[in-house]
A protein has these predicted regions:
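Short Pro-Cys-Gly-centered "Cys-loop" motif that presents a nucleophilic cysteine in a tight turn
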Residues: 1-39, 43-89, 96-216
Length: 216
């Protein structure tokens, strides 16, 4: 009797070979997104790009965020960048979105804007973002406040700003500081928060002092 040839199923060595490329963030299905919970997003850039905190690059990134903010406001989508900061080789954002799909599409669109602006600025082409972003839902007022401190004051861990508030962030436009701060004359690059947690809830734990540093 001729043995039957087996097709499909799990077999040792079967499937597409691995790329051998080390990935910073594991590729896995993203969890459920609750529209009432802002997300803290960390996004790394590829090695070889100059410090993102240089004036020219930080300006290009700020314009990309302002552009995506205007684009989504014009189209009345539920994706919003509400806080951000630029570090030497990565950036932090706090975003809102009405659905898991809107979150993914909004961040992918932002990634395209960032790549275009950064490549134009430094005269290169190709990949700019190193890997998938890492997104963490913020589910309590305390978690949102901690994330705002972490994002806006993160420069203290990397390249401390010479200014009272980090100019390479949305901090100059932030209205939750404990001390008065006149905003810049230019339009804010970020959107106003809509979720209760990001708009009001976090304030239960008090305003943020200029000298407050992120924990951890």
């Amino acid at each position: 009797m001729t043995p039957r040839t087996r097709h499909g199923g799990r077999r040792p060595g079967a499937g597409r070979p691995g790329s051998g490329r080390r990935v910073g963030v594991p590729h896995r299905a993203r969890p459920f997104h609750d529209k009432g919970h802002p997300e803290h997003v960390t996004w790394r850039f590829v090695p070889g790009i100059p410090s993102l905190r240089r004036r020219a690059l930080a300006g290009a990134i700020g314009r990309a965020i302002r552009g995506i903010t205007h684009s989504h406001a014009r189209r009345r989508t539920s994706f919003r960048v509400i806080h951000f900061s630029i570090q030497p080789n990565h950036m932090h954002l706090i975003v809102e979105a009405g659905s898991k799909r809107t979150l993914a599409r909004g961040l992918n669109g932002l990634g395209t804007w960032l790549a275009r602006r950064v490549n134009e600025r430094i005269g290169r082409s190709g990949k700019v973002l190193a890997d998938r972003y890492h997104a963490r839902p913020l589910t309590t007022p305390r978690a949102v406040r901690n994330a705002i401190v972490y994002v806006l004051q993160n420069h203290r861990h990397h390249e401390p700003s010479r200014h009272l508030v980090d100019e390479n962030s949305s901090g100059p436009w932030f209205r939750g500081w404990a001390e008065p701060l006149a905003p810049p004359p230019t339009e804010a690059p970020v959107a106003e928060p809509v979720t209760w947690l990001a708009r009001t809830g976090w304030k239960r734990h008090g305003p943020i002092a200029f000298g407050e540093a992120p924990s951890g």
